[in-house]
């Protein structure tokens, strides 16, 4: 490997703000912020969404049949389409 052309790979602490969860992951992200965690100082990056807070991974997904655009259409105009012709 050539010296000086590769990014600095190191362990970084990612903090999911919405779930208040911390992850230690190897990354090449640049950050000047640090955090004291488990008695050591680590580079620190904040996240809005991660697997700890994303609806797909937490199982708190919305059902399209109840909350989708088709359901909204049925609520607004369903009375006009009662099936009587």
From Swiss-Prot:
Q: Which Gene3D superfamilies match?
A: Ribosomal protein L31
Query: Taxonomically, which superkingdom?
Result: Bacteria
> What SUPFAM superfamilies does this protein map onto?
L28p-like
Question: Which positions carry the signal peptide feature in this UniProt record?
Answer: none
> What InterPro entries does the entry give?
Ribosomal_bL28/bL31-like_sf (IPR034704), Ribosomal_bL31 (IPR002150), Ribosomal_bL31_B (IPR027493), Ribosomal_bL31_sf (IPR042105)
Any one GO molecular function term: structural constituent of ribosome
Keywords from the named record: Ribonucleoprotein, Ribosomal protein
The biological processes this protein is annotated with in GO are: translation
Q: Does the keyword Ribosomal protein apply?
A: yes
A GO term from the CC aspect: ribosome
Q: Does the keyword Ribosomal protein apply?
A: yes
Q: Which family does it belong to?
A: Belongs to the bacterial ribosomal protein bL31 family. Type B subfamily.
Give the record's subunit note. Part of the 50S ribosomal subunit.
Q: What protein name does the entry list? A: Large ribosomal subunit protein bL31B
Origin organism of this chain?
Serratia proteamaculans (strain 568)
């Amino acid at each position: 490997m050539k010296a000086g052309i590769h990014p600095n790979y190191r362990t970084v602490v990612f903090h999911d703000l919405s779930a208040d969860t911390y992850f230690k992951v190897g990354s090449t992200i640049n950050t000047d912020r640090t955090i004291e965690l488990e008695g050591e100082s680590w580079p620190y990056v904040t996240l809005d969404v991660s697997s700890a807070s994303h609806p797909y991974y937490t199982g708190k997904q919305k059902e399209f049949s109840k909350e989708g655009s088709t359901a909204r259409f049925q609520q607004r105009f369903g009375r006009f389409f009662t099936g009587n012709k």
